[in-house]
Amino acid sequence: MFPKKIKACILFLLLTVPAALGAVWCAKHAYRYHLAVHPLPYSPEQGALLEKHRQDKRNARLNPHAPVLFLGSSTMEFWLKEGKHSWETWFSPLGCLNLGTRSETTGNLLWRLNDGLTSPLAPRINVLYSGVNNLGVQKSLGWTAFQGNVAIVKKIREIYSPETTAIIVIPPLIAQKGSRMETFRNCLLQHDFGENVHVLPLHFFLPGKDASLYTWDGLHLNALGYEAISPPLFRFLQQLLSRSSF
């Protein structure tokens, strides 16, 4: 039998340690939520990304009449690399402008929008793929990445009204069953973002359980992955662009 003092200590630990761990968990995810829904500038260690942001602003000034603007993380940027053939086949003829940036979180994109990324532009459609890096880089919850998308859509709506500009939100293309990524995807699919905002489930065009067929690392699309999702996205863009007004 344990002495009474040891029993008391054990009881104290059993009562207080879970509460303390719970408080730490809550504080950690509250901070990650803050990073997701508020503008997050690039750090001094992210000089290459800051230079990419400056180049994107220059590209925006050079293409002020682009009818479709692609925003988001590496899946967007790599459309011009691994998916180059698909981009040149389907989206270059439409005059689309791609300002996607690798490693970008929702907070980073909010900061870029605040910093005038889209100031010279008046696109009829914004295509958004953001939040994956919140889960990967910041280890956030799926719900947190979803709230980051809500904040981005709200910010875009401050810049462009629903009467002039549509928004397409693309949920995560690759998500394992039961993962935080799947939670993120489901949150986007179930949410009503409001007037003229469309959630487009392009992951349905990547059938099968073997992600390696469509990716080169289990997350980022390869050429085949981009070839699979480009035609349905192109058709939806055409459908929206054919409307005389929204």
PLM regions and their residue ranges:
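Catalytic His-Asp segment of secreted/periplasmic serine-dependent ester chemistry enzymes
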Residues: L173-F246
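A short beta-strand-loop structural module common to alpha/beta enzyme folds
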Residues: P93-T105
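Second-shell loop/turn segments in exported
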Residues: L97-L99, G136-G142, A175-K177, T215-H220
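N-terminal secretory targeting modules
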Residues: M1-L71, T75-E82, F234, L240-L241, ...
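Active-site flanking residues adjacent to catalytic metal/cofactor-binding acidic residues
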Residues: L71-S73, S130, L200
